[in-house]
Amino acid sequence: YGMALFSKSFSFREVVFQSKSKATAELYCSLLKELCSIKAGIKASPSGKIYTVSVKKAENVARIMSYFAHDKSETSLRINFSNFDCEECQSTFLRGAFLACGAVSSPEKDYHLEFSVPYMNLSKSLVTALQEKELAPKVTHRKGYNIIYFKDSEEIEDCLYIMGAGKSMFDMMNVKIVKEIRNTA
């Protein structure tokens, strides 16, 4: 759900997902097939750096919207929290949202994790979802996007853990330990 909702386009006209990672685009395709019985293809940009999955056929778009309990009466895009049946559902959702619109900096350089969201109400819903996981994101605006971000290394570690990125969390902790040792030596 997170990958679809935070994709390039999630509307009753079309659902379009873009990623710099072919593996992520392939995951999106496999989830569309598994959850909604929709077979979609991946198109690479001319440079080969962006992979796009588009669903434009009206009946397929309607199937996706119905599966995630969105209807045409909605005036703005928001997270439908009724899609979360369990604690893990929300963590999986956050992982998908991160794959669709998130970025994290290398801990060797800086501590920064962000979600870049074009819609105000959707970004507010994401802040609420993160706060429900006892995280305290900050919000700013950049180039027409709402940026939900973390700068504190411990908050980033917690967010990574919640999203199921345990290895990345431990990698970050190790870098932080090395930095602290170097600073005290």
Predicted regions and their residues:
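Conserved alpha/beta core segments of nucleic-acid transaction machinery
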Residues: I177-A185
